Amino acid sequence: MKKKLSPRDRLWVFADPSLKELIISCELQLAQPITVENLRLLVQERLINNFERFSWIISSAGYTSRANNLDLTQHVTANEQIVIDPQRPLWQFNLVGNTKIEIGVHHALADGLSLVAILRKLTEEKPGVISRTKSRNKPSWSMVLRTIQGVFKALFTILFSPNVKMTNLETSKNYSATSWVRPDRLTNRTDFETILENLILDPALEIKENSIIAVPISISSLTNRINNGLGNKFALSPLPKKSQISIVDEFRTMKKQGEVLGAYFISVFIGLMPTYLGRYLSKFVSSHIFGIVSGVQVSKSVLKLLGAEIKQIKAWAPILGGQKFSITSVHYAGEVTLNQVIRS
């Protein structure tokens, strides 16, 4: 039986009708070897048995059907490449040399923060039973007004912001990736800010003074994500680039709550559109965004998977059509890993 995806998940199908490009990627480096058989058992127990979406087959129109006979040998592999097949559920784990786990999940199934929730579920020492919950908190009038204000502000930024030119809608496949691993404490932001500022100010990227940098903000805690079945629960809050102002400090000091919620509701609105209109609007929004800056704190302490210590975690987000760059910081065990992807 077919079901329609939630609007916030369907948006990512509109942005990638091929269901092959918008893949969130993650790598776990283990201190001790594990076997692919044990990894399959763990994925079955912790993920497939708890989250229905890991059995979903998603169509390019944004509908889901359940894979009745999920073949784990196709989704948890050993020494192969991550290849997302639209005819199967859109995820894969690949064990390389028994000590590195590569993970690929399509954005329609889960966003980056949900991927963190998946990692936390896989590394639980005593897995608990997941009970579906819904928040009963009623929004205040001030929150409603800030949200309405944020919707109009986000719409103005996306549709009418002056001096911001749309980039080429064609998605370039020729991009280079560079990774840094910095042993910085979580309280030290210097290197992250320096790299971010240098990247945004790089004249080769042709980022204008009025360009928009999109900062993903989670609107749901990890616990709520797990209890409510994962999925996309974040907003892209637009942040203008201004000279001689720290992008990071500006974002942290500005009152962004209404704008964040406004951007979230716009994404839900686009996800509710008919397919042809939703695809058009998603391309327009993504083409307006020149880059994505995100940061995820996974754990301050070391986690274990199947008894093996996780030494390092890397993660990166896909580049949407029209974007110039993407940079992701992963905070794990007191260190920061920066992954940067730039279009050539």
Regions found by a protein language model. Name each.
Residues 2-5, 27-41, 47, 54-322, ...:
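Soluble acyl-CoA-dependent acyltransferase catalytic core bearing the H(X)4D motif
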Residues 1-21:
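Generic start-of-chain signal for non-secretory N-termini
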Residues 23, 98-100, 333-339:
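Glycine-rich, often proline-containing surface loops adjacent to acidic residues and nearby aromatics
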Residues 322-344:
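Extended, hydrophobic beta-loop-alpha segments that form or line the acyl/peptidyl-thioester binding
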